[in-house]
Amino acid sequence: MRKLLLLVLTLTLTLFSSCSLFTLTRGLDKMMNLHIGEVDLTAVDDGDHRGSFAFERWSNTVEVTVHNHAITAIRIIKDVKFAKAEVSSAVFEQVKTRQSIQIDAISGSTVTTKAYLKSIESALQP
C-alpha cells in the first residue's frame, strides 16, 4: 500500500511539473522571432494612445502619452502574467530616452520586452 501511494504521488508530481513547464514555454519560439516595427512619431497626434498585444502569457495593454511628437510617458493598463516592475520600467525608460521602440531587450526578459514593445507599437500606429 505504501509503495502504491509513493508511485501515485511520484506520477502526480511528474505530471504537474510537465504541465507547468509546457505552460511556461508555450509560444516562446514564436515570441523570440517576433518583429518589432518602426514608429513614425511625426505622424502621431498629441495625447494618450492605448495599445495592446495579445499572445499567451505575454498579453498586455499600455497607454502612451505623446506631446510635441515625443513619447513623454508610458503606463501599464494590463500587465503580462508574470510581471516584473524592473523590466517594464527599464523598457519604458529606454523607449522614452531613445524616442524609439528599436531598443535592446532587457537581459533575461527578451520575450517580455518584445511584448511591451508590440503594445507600444500598437498604440502609436496612425
Language model features: what each stretch is:
Residues 1-61, 65-126:
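Intrinsically disordered terminal and processing segments
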